[in-house]
């Protein structure tokens, strides 16, 4: 402010700076100013009572001061004197003037009536505010929220549609008085994310709306609720399955003849599928635990009765198939031997993901290296097909977490890359010269970070990358941590040249089961179809075909 202009504060409280001389004004961003608030009256006792006294005394000599009436109404409202607040707001409306302040009077009258459990008058006042200033939608939001909570979903939705007509009508947010930005940013859409279930909005529409919410960096309660509601809107990929040239029934028989003490000692779980040297390699994880109806991990005795779990065991069975006249012919099956030096309560390599590169079969998996006080490493290595065993090392990264899982591989220009994290997309490289076939710890180095949408802070890796044309495709997963976990999935497509994220799909399930998981898929170029292997409830491995064009129709962006 220029010292040559006679500025002064005006008002008995909620003062503002003005001058009797001519002056110009402009907006400054919050980053350009700093307020040193000395002796802030708002932090002292009896603020509302003091403000009420000051404003009432001032109105005795200036009864038509619109600013005093407005802030007196606010003070009565904040002091829970709702009838007096309503009276002040109505007087302020009668004076006319600044439309922003008048709208707030209507909105606050509605809020006061709501506090007094008079919802009919509250709704009337909020509607009057909308009539006065239709781009201010906070009152309409309150109506939507009220009707949704009362189970009047169709009414709530019609008010939502009204709001959508004006949602983007605010010319400049900085010119709005006390704008409640969260209403416009996510609260309106959050309401319809709940309403959609009750009024049967198409799942694909609701799926996209939920993704938009998750991309807005919303509060945790909105994020958690949206994830929970996705169980109703997630697309069912099984409905998109098609018939392929190769019958897949043989894949469900993998490992049926493994040795075990009784029928329930081990059972098949999640498969990993991979094309390698024109053959199909499938590794099926066999485990000794089951998930009971309460979501707890148990073993089963010889009679199939649940028992407490004394140890978590994994056995990986690899089957090799070649193609003959559109048939899958099994040519070999074996249990993969591994370096067992870290076997403890947890035994075996969990979640092996196969990856073909330069005529060798690579893999990643999870190895628990310490228990109790759980510590896991990503085990990375090669599958020695002649000796039917792994040769591998444990991967380390700077600032490694005690529990590391779900790192996935892809290749480009004769190099292997590792995706460590999906938010930001963090791509690493491993110096292959350090690979010495011993289960020792080796470092990976971050190669590149790529900015991605906010939803990817929830994403974890599922499959290794599959090259399709000039792109690299993945399946990833998201977990909604509720009383019982719910798993969701997405396809993600990276540009092969710069690894930027080109697009990703709407959220789907494999067959609408609560716990689902995949470790791999393959792309059949001759059919333009993917073969996907997955498990449900850590059991029941299954496989199906999906056309690439049907997956493309599911893409979110």
Positions of predicted regions on the chain:
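Structural motif corresponding to the intra-repeat A-B loop/turn of tetratricopeptide repeats
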Residues: 79, 116, 150, 199-200
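Start-of-helix register in tetratricopeptide repeats
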Residues: 67, 101-104, 137-138, 155, ...
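Catalytic-site signature of metal-activated, phosphate-bearing donor transferases
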Residues: 1-87, 236
């Amino acid at each position: 402010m220029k010292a040559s202009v006679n500025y002064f504060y005006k008002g008995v409280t909620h003062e503002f700076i003005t001058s009797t001389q001519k002056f110009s004004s402009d907006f400054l961003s919050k980053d350009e100013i700093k307020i040193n608030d000395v002796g802030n009256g708002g932090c002292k006792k009896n603020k509302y009572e003091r403000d009420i006294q000051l404003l009432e005394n001032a109105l005795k000599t200036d009864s038509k001061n619109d600013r005093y009436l407005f802030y007196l109404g606010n003070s009565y409202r904040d002091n829970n004197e709702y009838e007096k607040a309503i009276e002040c707001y109505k007087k302020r409306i009668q004076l006319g003037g600044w439309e922003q302040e008048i709208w707030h009077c209507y909105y606050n009258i509605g809020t006061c009536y709501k506090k007094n459990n008079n919802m009919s008058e509250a709704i009337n006042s909020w509607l009057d505010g909308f009539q006065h200033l239709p781009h201010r939608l906070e009152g309409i939001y309150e109506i939507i929220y009220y009707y949704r909570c009362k189970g009047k979903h169709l009414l709530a939705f019609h008010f939502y549609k009204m709001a959508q007509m004006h949602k983007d009508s605010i010319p400049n947010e900085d010119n709005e008085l006390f704008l409640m930005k969260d209403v416009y940013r996510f609260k309106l859409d959050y309401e319809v994310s709940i309403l959609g279930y009750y009024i049967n909005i198409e799942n694909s529409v609701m799926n996209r709306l939920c993704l938009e919410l998750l991309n807005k960096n919303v509060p945790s309660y909105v994020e958690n609720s949206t994830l929970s509601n996705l169980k109703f809107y997630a697309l069912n990929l099984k409905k998109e399955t098609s018939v392929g040239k190769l019958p897949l029934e043989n894949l469900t028989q993998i490992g049926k003849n493994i040795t075990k003490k009784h029928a329930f000692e081990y059972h098949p779980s999640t498969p990993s599928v991979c094309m390698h040297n024109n053959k199909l390699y499938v590794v099926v994880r066999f485990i000794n635990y089951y998930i009971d109806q309460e979501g707890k991990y148990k073993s089963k005795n010889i009679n199939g009765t649940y028992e407490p779990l004394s140890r978590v065991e994994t056995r990986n069975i690899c089957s090799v198939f070649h193609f003959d006249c559109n048939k899958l012919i099994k040519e070999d099956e074996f249990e993969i031997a591994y370096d067992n030096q870290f076997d403890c309560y947890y035994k075996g390599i969990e979640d092996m993901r196969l990856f073909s590169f330069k005529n060798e079969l690579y893999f990643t998996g999870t190895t628990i290296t310490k228990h109790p006080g759980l510590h896991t490493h990503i085990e990375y290595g090669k599958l020695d097909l002649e000796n039917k065993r792994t040769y591998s090392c444990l991967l380390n990264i700077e600032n490694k977490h005690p529990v590391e899982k779900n790192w996935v591989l892809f290749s480009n220009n004769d190099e292997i890359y590792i995706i460590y994290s999906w938010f930001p997309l963090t791509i690493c490289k491993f110096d292959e010269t350090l690979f010495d076939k011993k289960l020792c710890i080796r470092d990976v180095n971050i190669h590149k970070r790529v900015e991605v949408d906010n939803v990817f802070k929830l994403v974890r890796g599922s499959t290794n990358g599959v090259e399709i044309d000039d792109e690299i495709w993945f399946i990833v997963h998201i977990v909604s941590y509720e009383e019982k976990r719910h798993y969701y999935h997405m396809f993600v497509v990276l540009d092969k040249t710069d690894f930027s994220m080109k697009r990703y799909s709407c959220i789907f399930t494999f067959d609408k089961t609560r716990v689902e998981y995949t470790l791999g898929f393959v792309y059949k170029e001759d059919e333009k179809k993917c073969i996907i292997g997955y498990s449900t409830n850590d059991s029941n491995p299954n496989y199906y075909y999906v056309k690439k064009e049907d997956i493309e129709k599911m893409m979110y962006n």
